[in-house]
C-alpha cells in the first residue's frame, strides 16, 4: 500500500520505491529460476542503478548486466560478485575493459572482431585471459516499436549469422581470449512471448550448426527486453487516489 500520509510534507518531485514489492518479485524470480538447472537471471543495471535498489537485488542471487564501466563499479559496490557480472554494450572504452579484466568479471559480450582484438590486447597487457560471448544477430523480428528492435539483419548490432563460424574460429586462435558463450538481444518492450520462442528455436539451430563442427559453448544469453503493458484501466488508479 502506498503510504500517502507519510508523504504529505515531502517536497516534490521525488522517487518512491516499494521495496517490499521489489523483494516479493525477486523472491518469485529466485524460486522460478531455481526450478531449472544452470539457469541464471541477470538484472540490467541501466534500468536503475540506485545503490539501495542494487543491494536488495544482489541479496537474491541475481547477476548484473552492465553496459558501462560506471555500471560495473556500481554493481561491485552493491555487493554483486564479480563472477556474476556480464559486460555488454557497444563502444566499450579501454578503461572500462580494463576495469572488467582487473576485477575478473564473468564475461564480455563482444559485438565484432575489432572489439575482440582490443579486449585481447588489453588482456595480454594485464596477464589475463578474457572470457567472451559473441553477440550474434539472429535476424529475428520482435513485435515492438521499430526503433527499439535490435535482432533483425538490418539492425546494426552483433555479428551476422553467416559470419559466426569464422569469428569463433578466429577467436580460438587468440591466446588471451576464451570463448564461453553466445549472446542475443532482439529488442525492448516485448510483450509477445512468441518472439522469444522464435529466438530460442533459432539458437537451437545455431547450436546444432556449431555441434556439427565439434564446437560447443558453455553459456547461452538470450538477452532481455521483457515489456511492461501500459494498457491499464485508469479506474484502478483513480478510485484509490480520489480522496487525495
Q: Where are these predicted regions, by residue range?
A:
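Gly/Ser/Thr-enriched, mixed-charge loops and adjacent short helices
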Residues: 170-192
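A charged N-terminal "starter" segment
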Residues: 1-130, 169, 174-178, 205, ...
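Conserved anion-binding
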Residues: 115-176
Amino acid at each position: 500500500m502506498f503510504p500517502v500520509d507519510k508523504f504529505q510534507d515531502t517536497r516534490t518531485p521525488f522517487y518512491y520505491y516499494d521495496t517490499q514489492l521489489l523483494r516479493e518479485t525477486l523472491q518469485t524470480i529466485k524460486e522460478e529460476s531455481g526450478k531449472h538447472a544452470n539457469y541464471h537471471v541477470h538484472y540490467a543495471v541501466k534500468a536503475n542503478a540506485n545503490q539501495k535498489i542494487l543491494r536488495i537485488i544482489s541479496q537474491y542471487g541475481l547477476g548484473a548486466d552492465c553496459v558501462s564501466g560506471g555500471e560495473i563499479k556500481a554493481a561491485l559496490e552493491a555487493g554483486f560478485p564479480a563472477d556474476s557480472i556480464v559486460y555488454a554494450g557497444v563502444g566499450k572504452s579501454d578503461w572500462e575493459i580494463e576495469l572488467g579484466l582487473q576485477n575478473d568479471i564473468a564475461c564480455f559480450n563482444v559485438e565484432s572482431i575489432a572489439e575482440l582484438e582490443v579486449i585481447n590486447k588489453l588482456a595480454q597487457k594485464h596477464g589475463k585471459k578474457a572470457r567472451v560471448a559473441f553477440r550474434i544477430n539472429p535476424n529475428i523480428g520482435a513485435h515492438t516499436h521499430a526503433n527499439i528492435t535490435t535482432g533483425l539483419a538490418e539492425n546494426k548490432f552483433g555479428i551476422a549469422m553467416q559470419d559466426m563460424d569464422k569469428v569463433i574460429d578466429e577467436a580460438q586462435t587468440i591466446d588471451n581470449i576464451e570463448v564461453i558463450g553466445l549472446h542475443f538481444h532482439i529488442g525492448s518492450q516485448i510483450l509477445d512471448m512468441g518472439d522469444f520462442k522464435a529466438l530460442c528455436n533459432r539458437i537451437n539451430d545455431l547450436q546444432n550448426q556449431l555441434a556439427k563442427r565439434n564446437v560447443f559453448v558453455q553459456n547461452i544469453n538470450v538477452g532481455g527486453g521483457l515489456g511492461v503493458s501500459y494498457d491499464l484501466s485508469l479506474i484502478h488508479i483513480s478510485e484509490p487516489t480520489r480522496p487525495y
